[in-house]
Amino acid sequence: MTIKPCFCAAMMTILTRASNNQPVSLGKQIASSGEGVVWETNLSGYLAKIYHDPTVERIKKLEVMVGNPPADPMLSRNHIAIAWPDDLLKDGSGAAVGFLMPAVRQSRELPSIYNPRLRKRNAPGFNWYYLHATALNTAWIIQAIHAKGYVLGDIKPQNILVNDSALVAVIDTDSFQVRDLQTGQVYRCTVGSEGFTPVELLGKDFSVTDQTEIHDRFRLAVMIHYLLFGYHPFSGEWTGSGESPDQTELIRKGFWYGGQNSLIRPSQNTIPLDVVHPEIERCFLKCFNDGHTAPHLRPTAE
């Protein structure tokens, strides 16, 4: 398969699936980013992502992903939980320019669920039980991804979608860290989101850093804390001298409101940590206290 150095949707005449040469036509544009554009297609249940710059490395990474998908833990519920690349897409010259992926319908971005004001407006029926169910389903999905050796790397709440039944879907999966099990080549996740980067990765150059699922454990714990409490665990009322450090510095120092000798305490009118089941509380303490100096002690997604 040949790979063109760049691709412009306006220049496109024909797209075909790499696996069987089935024609694919693009419909309405539904999202755009620095990497590429996501389109509706003529294939029921599928979207296409077309890259602005489909580099050799990007396409090789996709080939590994297409050939080794994770098990979808929600298939028995007739729900797409992982918007995984399903097939490469070629243009009329045979160059790979993007990929097909399953569409996730009738779902909201995670912040509209964990933010109390947005939840009241957009999902008033989402109660304490549904928030727990969403957290559990998120952990199941991440466990399935880890089981295949993948690392999410950059967890954006906007890339986790939730429907009215608390069923979860992860999108933007082509940004994950991928390891080719045959060659050992690692296709890294080169970016990170503020507030979701564990202490041992702060200041690291992600383009040359191999990540592990241990790093994802911190990210998952932050995400679940957002879901159950509505705010970031490394936030609250600063009790030290001077102005409160920014969130990245609080993570670096291990200052969260449940930490020993922490200079952060819960803000007024926030939900206390001990309101959740003792086992969930133990997981948070294990992750943010013990895991600060010994990352391998963070609870796994499983």
Q: Which residue stretches match the model-derived regions?
A:
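Activation segment/activation loop of eukaryotic-type protein kinase catalytic domains
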Residues: 158-201
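Catalytic-loop of the protein kinase fold
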Residues: 142, 146-165
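Conserved C-lobe activation region of Hanks-type protein kinase-like domains
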Residues: 213-215, 224-281
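The N-lobe alphaC helix and its flanking beta3-alphaC-beta4 segment of protein kinase-like domains
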Residues: 54-78
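Conserved C-terminal segment of Hanks-type protein kinase catalytic domains
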Residues: 296-302
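ATP-binding glycine-rich phosphate-binding loop
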Residues: 12-57, 79-80, 91
